[in-house]
């Protein structure tokens, strides 16, 4: 942390000189009062950044911020809502991060908001304001150092920062309503500070404390954004350790997504032009979570508010230019992030692929998640998010119903963020994440399902979603499987996790990283669904991650193969995540067996993780192409099914079907994400990552298999796969898990296919048989190797054994004949057709069919008398009269 701070300080001082110049220019261009406000704002931003840095790396810096800026900032707080929005965010970040300076920074935020109008040009990077303020006023070396630290953090986490910057840029460029910007920036910064790589658990704890204080202060000081900020704060406080980082990344990604949604072109420009955005500062503090929430709201408002004022957009453009000058390097990053966000918006699953390929994709997922959160926060800002962190996630997902794909991605991002934070974050953060994960996961699945039903969910497929959980034994699985998993494998997962962590981490993390990298690229597209979320969430919470990962390795592997939700569900159901019973439901119908298998696998899996990871990696790689191809179908069906899942999560049949489809997406979706996210997590928790990788590999195999199969087949495959996976997992708990998992996936596919075909074929066969019999009779054995009914009658007329006795000519020239013994003729016809139940009525229907064909005609006024329309000339004539 200290080294990072020094590095940040070095970069921050350089930045500060540039930012100071731009800030001075901006403030000078603005009124003197605004310039003074900007100076106090910059001071507050610097103090806030320092407080963020201090909050995160060292609490020492926090005292610096509670300096004079608060009184100055208080008056101008609302002077220029659009312009001051970003500064406000910085101030809010400071508030969030600094307990003593929270109030002062709130005041400073207000002042900065006023000053922000002139500062808007600086807005290209909140860092510029903060740094320039630091350079000018340099309230204290700590503040300047803190700001650089935040900058360093930003540089360290350039992908998330890029998105955050994108978000802040869009905020600045849009200069939407002050409220929106204020909330958005606060969220951004709140998320950013946790995302700083150097944060430790102690830092996370500090951040959580700061978040709590910021929450309170925001409640008091934030006029419009107080509720939204509180919600993100509350959201972060429980998850502060893990979720702060996740939230920051998520916010960054979400901001980028929101910006892309709001203005694709503007975002591109913003990404290119403004690589220095408040993002850098926001990274410094724990307030980033709240800032990201606010930023999401502000980003949304920007979308709406771009039309609000042209001047705001102009200011934002200036800010973007300033940012361009400040950080041209981030142009590429921002363009990439922007493109990613665009891809996410348009192809929720596609972005996931990107995400799986690189940390930037994870950030994209996070961005989507944050965008969803922001959107959700805007509707729920007042009270929903304040309720609880888990609620915040849930509502975010619910609000995020905008697009199932985005929601899934966001969820995945959240999971990835949580997993990243959980790996490096404190156990508190993990616990918070675990709590949130269960809530968020069920909610996400629901939202995910709803969205997918509506859009994709997001087309992300939720095997572990509530629907997924309830897919087979919804209620028992939801309540019992997680319990079963936690109870049956609850103790073992920890031991396995410990084993994986202690013994397997290096190799596992390496193989997991390799497998995740390989599978993430291809599987990311496919596995953008719920699976990532459960895995990510469990990754988020170290405890839950380990348990979940182990479960995902054990149950999920089987369950992935059987039902994409198996890994996702079992992971959420890990001891750390008992709240995720709903998600476990998918794997629940496997749950007891899966839990047992998972437990056995956890014990042996850790040993076999490397081999499993490698094998699974190969399998995943081979399946990635298939999964990617199937992604589109899976995403579509997954989206629809996710919505169904949420609605039918408690209906086993529907749930099964949904799971079948979800497994496609979830198997595909979760694995890539689990791999991308598990890469970060795998290093901290090699064992867990191995589990996730194994589960991902199994899921990938199952997903590819399931994808091949129809949705019904997928459902059958999931059911059979869960059973087979449980059995195979238990049997192959050892190093052969990778093989078993593929087997499970293939088995699940085969079983599902057989079940589906068997059941349907039998039914279909029965139905067709009757028609065939009837049709055969009606069509006079056309399909038979013998003759048609008219040909049969003609033969009878030429056979002395039957001619005068059962049938005879009444007018040979005209082809008129009579059925002397209609019953005998019908019996003969039945014998000929091998239909002993043939009768004249049935045969008569066949004869009437020839009326239409122009072969026979009915002679009016005479029973059983028919006429050949065209009498063949080569028939053997029999003198029926003589006989």
From Swiss-Prot:
Residue stretches of biased makeup (Gly residues): 563-576
Biased composition (Polar residues): 223-239
Coiled coil: none
Database matches in Pfam families: Ets (PF00178)
Keyword Nucleotide-binding part of the UniProt annotation: no
GO terms of molecular function: DNA-binding transcription activator activity, RNA polymerase II-specific; DNA-binding transcription factor activity, RNA polymerase II-specific; sequence-specific DNA binding
Key word Cytoplasm present: no
Record-level GO cellular component terms: nucleus
Biased composition (Acidic residues): 241-264
Comp. bias regions, Basic residues: 672-688
Start-end of DNA-binding region: 787-869
Induction: The expression of this protein is developmentally regulated and is correlated with the 20-OH-ecdysone induced activity of puff 74EF.
Family designation: Belongs to the ETS family.
Name of the protein this chain belongs to: Ecdysone-induced protein 74EF isoform B
